[in-house]
């Protein structure tokens, strides 16, 4: 007999009591509040052995700044990494960043923070806590962030430049960010939200008195507004005792300032806020319908979760309708979606939002089409079949969350605690949630959902925000005209939504099965099955995610078998297929048929391979293999869908070059590859050379013969259940071995271009709304394609990144960050590439560039900094332990060994330990000795 907990019995027996029933917090969390008001959440999680995450969350943000402090909430976040009482960085005690990196916690990846309008959160993630001293030190950092920042004059002045460069990075090439800053005074007129974005005023950042920052810290960083969150392989009771001892001594201010949550007023007439920017490529519209938030104290009942459930169904169904419209031959908009949540930047007001990209030649038509669907839903609701699909999908998500409840990484539970502390969202178990969804699916009716639609979607309390290109050829309708577009569309008469009844199976008549002709043990613990049509299947059984199976089916070929003249078609080959649906079903029908399934497959074609990749739940493995069969053997043509996609793309590309970043990227690729025809960007004129017939032919030829294809399955696979499915859906793929393949003729490999052999610097200027210099430096050199070479490159880019952080960011305050990345390939010849990227003030470019080159030369001449190299190796060893319990890692390792002949797994830890400074130095030396360096810089005029 199935055993139910009391709350489950309540759900099953008394639906009318559920709505008012108080929720019990997930008992796996140890929570409490100290006398000084500090809240804590502690949870044991053994998924990542020896690893824990440490967070401090603050219910404070930029909305609490005084006018003279604009930007200081965010500035303070930066200062938390620049000196605290116990981590001074003065030679007597280490600074926070060096200490964390000495134990394998990487700045940026594991050690970070963010500031928003109403909250500030700091994290030390993926901390190896095998030694108690490390755990104690992580808690001590949280303690210092809470109460003991030094905020010295010297460090404040050093950070001003870094903040200014972050402002430059966030605004450069991001027109919507700039326009949002400009529309907020209209949207929030008369409130603190008019000017509240965290980056603040650069005039204040550059010049504020030190006292203003210290005043903000003293006033708002206090225990009654803070929470400590610790999740991972720890003993909760012991951590709780440490928190009480360490944080309990922090005093609570006697006359603490009131933490005000500023309200947002309703509006009778629509507020219209428009803005234009010369770097904005398309017209974006956001129509908000404001409504009151649920008070935090009312989020503790089952009724609150039921309301959220109904809202999620409404959004799912409405977005499905909007997606259908995009399949038309001439789609009425570029994109459209529906959302619900906080109104813009304010947590004190919620809103339903319609977000859509307008066709510039028919702005009114875009408004009409999007609002028509929201009005249709508001007036007539949704059909029973739509509701059933949405409920099925919601149940599948809950079932997966329950099945994988013990497979969750630490951040999953951290986010639960954060949402509870910052937004009062309830923390419930996956078992409770699953039973709740099942009960909602049984008891929530279409009438209830359709009543809720009328509350969510309204013609009152509306705000329209429009971002548009600032181009002479584009005429933006006046604000009153845009308002009239909305009101007229909301006043029209509409017919109810209707759809044909779904019938049939994905594959009405399954193919007669093939056979398994051989089985053997394979690499990395795989089982290898040879199929009768020549496909070789590798199965890696894992229990890392209880309800996940991933597949990959690939073969040699790709676009390199087609001439340069076909290059305009390449970007559309796979999208043309997926936009058409598959088998007998168009894309919209296929989406509906898969609503109750957790399965999907996507084709892709690269330079040298064609692949089908997908994921599914354990129960839906059959569906995933059916889709694999259909995309290989029975792709679908849909001229209307293809023409619609091309038409939408043509409209989207109208102002493609408006963004300077696009022009820069085009120039970058042209310089690197010498304007090679296979490396050309897609522009409006390119679309005229795209042929659907040719796109279809390329796809069919790439997936014509499975005889030399390889399949890899990774996950919770039942091999006995898998065998008949492989015979039915994989062994029957067209193949020269079973005489079902249609072989293309005259195939010849056309090599993909390499980066040019050159040593040169290119600089050009372009008008930008945010002055900046954007620099990319590429080094290419021949390097053996081995695991050791890959590791040496990895460590080189990490120690170089550290050197740049110290010299360019911290010492000079010259950039928000220098990015270093690498590639190692064996396509035409084994080649390595190192890429260095940064953005800065044009006035600082000449000063910073020599430093960038000098740091690399220093490593080539003298070797890497020993401390930096030790930190990089510790980080790699730590992440290796995290990676090997992930299905994606095994998919990557096995695929690359089968495809490229390189084993990234075996002996990796020893390889890391044995890597020497001389190995890294030699890699840097080889890189410089190649004399193949291309620098491309774009400066503002």
Give the ranges of each region predicted by the language model.
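Non-catalytic, conformational "gating/processing" segments within enzyme and secreted inhibitor domains
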Residues: 148, 155, 160-161, 213-244, ...
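Peptidyl-prolyl cis-trans isomerase
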Residues: 148-156, 444-448, 452, 636-642, ...
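Active-site His/Glu-centered metal-binding helix of metallohydrolases
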Residues: 72-80, 314, 573
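M16 family metallopeptidases and their MPP-like homologs
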Residues: 41-43, 48-65, 71-73, 91-144, ...
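Hydrophobic, small-residue-rich alpha-helical packing segments that form membrane-like cores
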Residues: 155, 160-225, 229-231, 236-244, ...
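Metal-associated gating/positioning segment near the N- to mid-region
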Residues: 79-91
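Proteolytic maturation boundary segments
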Residues: 19-42, 235-323, 327-329, 388-392, ...
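Bacterial Sec-dependent N-terminal signal peptides
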Residues: 1-22
